[in-house]
């Protein structure tokens, strides 16, 4: 898959980003490079390859990863924070509607 310059200009218009012609061309080259890399990765046969939880484990299988336990380190201060909030309901913060 590759993009054309018209695609980049349309995307920049949708994202409301002003790009010069030079910037559009540079962005086109970068995006097409990314798509080429994704196509290369998609072409690799990964049948039978086990997913890794950490990439270094594949290189150094004897290394024990020093991952800390997932423990709470901060006290629950929701009530304190909600006392100074303008509006709350059932433990949630109420905010003005921003999208119609």
Curated annotation (Swiss-Prot):
Query: Zinc among the record's keywords?
Result: no
Reaction catalysed by this chain? L-glutamyl-tRNA(Gln) + L-glutamine + ATP + H2O = L-glutaminyl-tRNA(Gln) + L-glutamate + ADP + phosphate + H(+); L-aspartyl-tRNA(Asn) + L-glutamine + ATP + H2O = L-asparaginyl-tRNA(Asn) + L-glutamate + ADP + phosphate + 2 H(+)
A UniProt-annotated Pfam family: GatC
> In terms of domain of life, where is this protein from?
Bacteria
Name this polypeptide is given = Aspartyl/glutamyl-tRNA(Asn/Gln) amidotransferase subunit C
Q: What gene is it encoded by?
A: gatC
Record's family? Answer: Belongs to the GatC family.
* Species, as recorded: Herminiimonas arsenicoxydans
Query: Which NCBIfam families would you find in this protein's record?
Result: gatC
Protein role: Allows the formation of correctly charged Asn-tRNA(Asn) or Gln-tRNA(Gln) through the transamidation of misacylated Asp-tRNA(Asn) or Glu-tRNA(Gln) in organisms which lack either or both of asparaginyl-tRNA or glutaminyl-tRNA synthetases. The reaction takes place in the presence of glutamine and ATP through an activated phospho-Asp-tRNA(Asn) or phospho-Glu-tRNA(Gln).
Q: Which GO terms describe its biological process?
A: glutaminyl-tRNAGln biosynthesis via transamidation; regulation of translational fidelity; translation
Name the coiled-coil region(s): none
């Amino acid at each position: 898959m590759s993009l054309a310059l018209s695609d980049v200009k349309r995307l920049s218009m949708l994202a409301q980003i002003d790009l010069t012609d030079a910037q559009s061309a540079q962005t086109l080259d970068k995006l097409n490079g990314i798509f080429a890399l994704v196509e290369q990765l998609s072409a690799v046969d990964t049948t039978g390859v086990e997913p890794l939880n950490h990439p270094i484990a594949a290189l150094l299988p004897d290394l024990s990863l020093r991952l800390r336990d997932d423990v709470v380190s901060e006290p629950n201060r929701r009530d304190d924070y909600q006392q100074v909030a303008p509006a709350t309901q059932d433990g949630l913060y109420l905010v003005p509607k921003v999208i119609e």
